[in-house]
């Protein structure tokens, strides 16, 4: 079985910018590249799980999300780092348009994408972690017995007042990695 770190994307890996999809707007959070590289070097599967409601709302396409993920991989490759997989939910139950307006099991805080990734990568949840800047990023991890960390980047400073007792707080993705390695 494999150990993994499940990462939220916006506000955790990259600077939070509402409905980010343009490559020119992408910016890693401080220490994120180094953190991902350390996770790779320590044999953690690095798996991104992200809600992409901008697709549901019609702001951008799934192809735009995929292009941004390809760009992220190219940037990480320059530093001998990589993300093992990107999973994202393009749905929204209220604000979705057309086929994207639905109540699904993949939109966090539901755990459908976590369950899929756990199965796809044969993940040992007891040796794994989740990191995000919103409680909704971490609830599905906690529901699957994955140790969870709320970062103070993105929305983390606003979310911390509602933190659950089974979640830890850390400054950013890099500080999380230094705590577990």
From Swiss-Prot:
Residues at the catalytic site: 8 (nucleophile), 10 (proton donor)
Residues binding Mg(2+), per UniProt: 8, 10, 133
Enzyme class: hydrolase
Binding sites annotated in the UniProt record for substrate: 8-10, 16-19, 50-53, 107-108, 134
Xref: Pfam families: PNK3P
InterPro entries documented for this protein: HAD-like_sf, HAD-SF_hydro_IIIA, HAD_sf, Heptose_bisP_phosphatase, Histidinol-phos, PNK3P
Catalyzed reactions per annotation: D-glycero-alpha-D-manno-heptose 1,7-bisphosphate + H2O = D-glycero-alpha-D-manno-heptose 1-phosphate + phosphate
Gene3D superfamilies from the UniProt entry: HAD superfamily/HAD-like
Family: Belongs to the GmhB family.
Protein name: D-glycero-alpha-D-manno-heptose-1,7-bisphosphate 7-phosphatase
Lineage, opening ranks: Bacteria, Bacillati, Bacillota, Clostridia, Eubacteriales
């Amino acid at each position: 079985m494999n150990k993994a770190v499940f990462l939220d994307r916006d506000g955790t890996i990259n600077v939070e910018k509402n409905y980010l999809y343009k490559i020119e707007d992408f910016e890693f959070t401080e220490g994120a590249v180094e953190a991902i590289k350390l996770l790779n070097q320590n044999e953690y599967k690095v798996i991104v799980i992200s809600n992409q409601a901008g697709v549901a709302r019609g702001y951008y396409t799934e192809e735009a999300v995929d292009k941004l993920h390809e760009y992220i991989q190219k940037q990480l490759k320059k530093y001998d780092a990589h993300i093992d997989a990107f999973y994202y939910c393009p749905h929204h139950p209220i604000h979705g348009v057309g086929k994207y307006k639905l109540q699904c099991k993949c939109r966090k805080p539901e755990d459908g994408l976590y369950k899929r990734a756990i199965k796809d990568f044969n993940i040992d949840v007891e040796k794994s972690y989740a990191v995000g800047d919103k409680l909704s990023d971490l609830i599905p991890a906690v529901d699957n017995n994955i140790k969870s960390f709320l970062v103070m980047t993105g929305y983390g400073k606003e979310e911390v007042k509602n933190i659950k007792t089974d979640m830890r707080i850390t400054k950013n993705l890099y500080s999380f990695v230094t705590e577990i390695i």
